[in-house]
Amino acid sequence: MATHPLQSDERGFREPKLSVIPSGSFLMGSHCGQDNERPVHRVHLDSFCLAKTQVTNLDYSVFLAAVSAPPPPFWNDVRFSLPEQPVVGVSWFEALRYCQWLATVTRKIYRLPTEAEWEYAARGNVEGAAFPWGDSAPTAQPRYAHRWLTGPEIVGQSQPNPFGLFEMCENVHEWCGDWFDPDYYLNSPELNPQGPGSGERRASRGGSWRHHIKISRCAARSSIPPSFQYADYGFRVACSL
């Protein structure tokens, strides 16, 4: 697939708004979660940037036009077609291709975040909390209680976490760069873990608009094969410093 660099004022291109995530260490995983969230272990990460919001339909439309690619499934479905809704139906390969295109356009190192980066960023420097706001259940939060949705919401509507990130644990599941291994934490390196070297499924994080409980715990892990295209799967970009 060819790429065609754009100027920032051409055809609606806009570079993602990024939060700088400071270097630091945190306890990754959960003593109270699923087996694949254990053992809880110390991780240290170098500083990186993460997009404040999930990639939107508007952002993705510029990419499609630039590389002459067909749209993903659900593109014309009215439940998912607002410009500022997160793009859905994007496979891991397509999310990676978007990052590669964005890197070409901006001459920066755009990529998908690792699982460790995602969890660290979602926690917002709040050590050990189950959710971005603390440990109280989602059903106790006015935004999340007793809501039925037919699609994802416009990005940037939630209260941002301490790192200035929106919808980190909700709206759509977000692809990560790692392969997925349920036992990876048993031997994960402490410094900048990148995930296993191979696998059959790619890691993802975050909650989903179509679940009864629409927000996930910060430590909750998920995965699907990288070719799958679901209506509650999207992504946000990271950028190396």
What does each model-found stretch correspond to?
Residues 1-4, 8, 12-16, 59, ...:
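Low-complexity, Gly/Pro
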Residues 1-3, 8, 20, 47, ...:
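Generic detector of low-complexity/intrinsically disordered segments
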Residues 5-8, 35-40, 221-226:
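Short, P/G- and charge-enriched loop/turn segments at secondary-structure junctions
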Residues 10-72, 90-93, 169-170, 177, ...:
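A short glycine-rich, aromatic-capped structural motif
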Residues 21, 27, 31-32, 70, ...:
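Functional-site microenvironments in short loops/helix caps that host divalent-cation chemistry
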Residues 41, 48, 163, 202, ...:
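Residue-level detector of short, conserved catalytic/binding motifs and their immediate flanks
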Residues 49-51, 101, 236-238:
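Residues within well-ordered beta-strands of beta-sheet-rich folds
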Residues 231-241:
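Short, structured beta-strand segments at or near domain termini in extracellular proteins/domains
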